[in-house]
Amino acid sequence: MSTGKVALEVKELHAFYGKSHILQGVNLHVNEGEIVALLGRNGAGRSTTVKAIMGMVDNRGEVLWRGKNVLGMKAYEVAHLGIGYVPESRDIFPKLTVHQNLMLGQKSAKKLGRWSFDDMYKMFPRLRERQHIEAGVLSGGEQQMLTLCRTLMGDPDLIMIDEPTEGLAPAIVQLVAEYLMELKRRGICVVLVEQKLAIALQISDRVYVMGDRRIVFEGTPAELKADANIRKEWLEV
């Protein structure tokens, strides 16, 4: 449950790819225990925003994680502070088994986190069935499950997930939504980069809409549903 206490605050975030000015002053925040959706069309800057927060692209501004400015840190340093990132590319180690991939996600073999291997396999029984299979032969949906689970094994306090439902069957999409709600129940903040409006509005506490590489709307799912002009201008194809 959201406490109203700010966990992540982004102030005037700019990002650059070479000489290209991609993000132009993004401002957003995530409260403790909240699911926040970042919506927008392709090219709006959503993926670049989470990459800039992680320190994966050239940036300037402020990124405050529980009051500490992490801008300028390397991605692995940001991760060690408790921010997890699940890219759209479904990065796995294809020649390692499912279980070995999960083992690589552990922060420390000696430290017990919120999540165990059994937790992962209970949420995604298909991974249990295939735990000794090389990850490279998994379906796209199974690889998405594995990427999410491996990130969780690092015990993050906030997880940023880029297009987790892309290309997945409807039944798997709903499974991912339930999974994200379980993260919230366990006290983990979620930043969800998503194009499927229905799923984002179903599970999010608040939403941001991006357009022209900046934030053009902030509000609750109900407020976005009621604002036909914003949806038409910035979301509908």
Question: Locations of the language-model features?
Answer:
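Glycine-rich phosphate-binding loops of nucleotide-dependent enzymes
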Residues: S2-V237
